[in-house]
């Protein structure tokens, strides 16, 4: 049981002990990888997920992250996984982001060093069931540019594929049809 190793405070916050932060969600993905945030640490923000959020993060790890890790046999660099609402506000993200891991879904931003991010996104698109896949800020002439955003829903996956790009100083999204 994932939830048995946590202590829950009366206010609903979670106390995570050092050994728990290394809790394995899959053979190669830990809870710590999905919750670590330099901004949260710097600002003193408690970025610990609650019980349902942990279950959603585990579903993301089992159905998206571990299959990628196993296919490429290389570690993923997760730049952003779980974000509590306070952290989302701090970085200018929506508190409705799937990174908050509520409503049966969770998301992560990641890449694999040495693997073309377009190739990585195509693998996810062709081989895995996902809710949303975004190839973010990838430049065709720079294979390691940008990163992948991918979410997984335990309820209903849309298999929505997008590409994010900057135009006139704004972030835009368009369907990714490859």
Residue map of PLM features:
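Short, Lys/Arg-enriched N-terminal segments with co-localized hydrophobic residues
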Residues: 1-22
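Extracytoplasmic cell-surface/polysaccharide-interacting catalytic and binding patches
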Residues: 17-71, 165-178
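A residue-level signal for beta-strand positions that form part of recognition/binding surfaces
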Residues: 22, 28, 75, 107, ...
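Single, functionally critical "micro-switch" positions that shape active/binding sites
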Residues: 22, 83, 98
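Glycine-rich, flexible loop/turn motifs
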Residues: 25, 87, 96
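Extended, low-complexity, intrinsically disordered C-terminal regulatory tails
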Residues: 62-93
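Catalytic cores and adjacent binding grooves of peptidoglycan-active enzymes
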Residues: 98, 102-106, 112-178
């Amino acid at each position: 049981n994932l939830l048995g190793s946590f202590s829950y405070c009366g206010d609903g916050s979670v106390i995570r002990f050092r050994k728990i932060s290394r809790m394995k969600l899959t053979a190669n993905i830990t809870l710590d990888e999905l919750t670590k945030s330099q901004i949260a640490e710097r600002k003193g923000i408690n970025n610990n997920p609650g019980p349902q959020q942990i279950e959603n993060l585990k579903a993301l790890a089992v159905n998206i992250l571990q299959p990628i890790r196993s296919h490429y046999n290389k570690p993923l660099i997760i730049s952003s996984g779980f974000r509590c609402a306070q952290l989302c506000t701090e970085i200018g993200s929506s508190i409705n982001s799937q990174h908050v891991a509520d409503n049966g879904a969770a998301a992560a931003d990641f890449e694999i060093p040495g693997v073309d991010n377009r190739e990585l996104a195509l693998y996810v698109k062709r081989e895995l069931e996902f809710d949303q896949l975004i190839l973010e800020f990838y430049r065709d002439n720079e294979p390691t540019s940008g990163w992948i955003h991918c979410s997984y829903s335990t309820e209903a996956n849309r298999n929505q594929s997008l590409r994010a790009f900057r135009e006139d100083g704004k972030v835009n999204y368009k369907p990714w049809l490859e």
